[in-house]
Amino acid sequence: MHPLRGSICLNCLSKWSPWRRMSTRNTTEPPLSKKQQKRKMKEETITQYAGDNSKRADRVYAWGCASTGAIGIPSYLKPEKGQHPIYTVRQPARVKFMDRANLKVTKVGCGYGFTVYVTISFRGNRLYGTGINTDSQIGYHEFPRNTGRVLDYVIEPTLIDLPLDHRDTTNITQVACGRGHTLILTDKEGVFTLGNNAYGQCGRPIVEGEVYGQNPRVNKMKDIPDNIAKIVCGHDHSFLLTTDGEVYSCGLGCDGQTGLGHYRTTSQPTKIKGGIEGVKITQIASTGDCVLALSEEGDVFAWGNSEYNQLSIVTEQTQINIPKYLPLKHCGKIIKAASAGSKCAIVNTKGELFVWGYGILGKGPKLESATEPEMIPPPLFGCNELEPDVSVIDVVCGLHHFVALTNNGSVYTWGKDKHGCLGLGIQRDQYFPLKVSIPAETHSIQCGVDHTVVLCKSFC
């Protein structure tokens, strides 16, 4: 056989290509014009369609600050020879560890420079953490084993061992992360906590001079209700939400963020009363020190920090230590809420999103302060004549940025682009929602202070 015989790419048949000269030398056919080449390529194109029974794969994407290890891709911080470290990821990057380990991620918690995953595999329900571990917020990791070398930074998802009594039958249902602490909710064995407890945010007594780094201790909350349904971490405080809609809190209270009627620290989870007493609460939102609570009826209650007029609708004070009802009737029935460092966002049953507070709110550079909720125009989230049914179904936030999810699986971000946390591929702040390019359909979103993680399904 002639060494050059075989298939030749039609794109290579350019005027000056040696392949063209070889191909025309041994044939009587005239050379193809560009139009004929394109037509032939189109005829030879093979299109593969996904079958009706094809299974869509789970995907995890992350972006933002990679220097802490929170992204969970080790090659960014330990590159191969000839490559440079990557400290900022400005576009969605696929976290392939889950695929290699055959893990399905069900829940995610994002803290300040660390990420915790709840996973399911043939081994059962497990917890993995990656990122900053200076306060043991993602567990005790000795590497290599039996060397006494405990990791302050973990650059790839690593198993977090919990002292479960019934490891094979107890399931982890949720995880929440604060500045330096983590809460883990189980279906049969209560709530476990890891990390910094300087203000009682882990729900146990404060120990003066306690060293949190390289600490193998895993705490189980005591004297709490048996029917905890959700857990939430703020800056240095925590919330427990029961199936009855009652809310318990502990931790730092200097801005009234615990909602217990005082400004002291509290190490024992205590029931919050005030405006939410007797009201069934379904969601708590608190990334910073301002807290929003949603009721089953779609009403909004709030307490905590109001230095940026987040709560100026009901008070002129800069802090509120007890829940108050926010009269937001013009916004409709609220189903989702997010509370950042200086601004808030809510979503109603129509899929409309409202913002208020101070900073980059999402309605352009001219609006940096609002004392009452203002609606971001729906077309900014992809609602238009071609897709009139697109609506927002969820919103979360870091301290300075928002992330919204629409009912067609698209993700939009806006705010300060700290360490690439917006995922837009450019280094600049974003003053209105812009769609993030993700090669999959997103169904869950989570934010840390400077990174973002989304759970997705492949398109086919």
Predicted regions located by residue number:
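N-terminal mitochondrial targeting presequence
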Residues: 1-29
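Residue-level signature of beta-propeller blades and closely related beta-rich strand-turn architectures
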Residues: 66, 77, 121-122, 133, ...
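Conserved core positions of repeat-based scaffolds
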Residues: 62, 114-117, 129, 181-184, ...
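Solenoidal tandem-repeat scaffolds enriched in leucines and small polar residues
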Residues: 175-325, 337
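Blade-level signature of beta-propeller repeat domains, shared across WD40, Kelch, NHL, RCC1
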Residues: 410, 416, 424-460
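Loop/turn-rich, solvent-exposed surfaces of beta-rich toroidal or solenoidal domains
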Residues: 341-343, 352, 360, 377, ...
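Beta-propeller domains
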Residues: 56-95, 120-153, 205-210
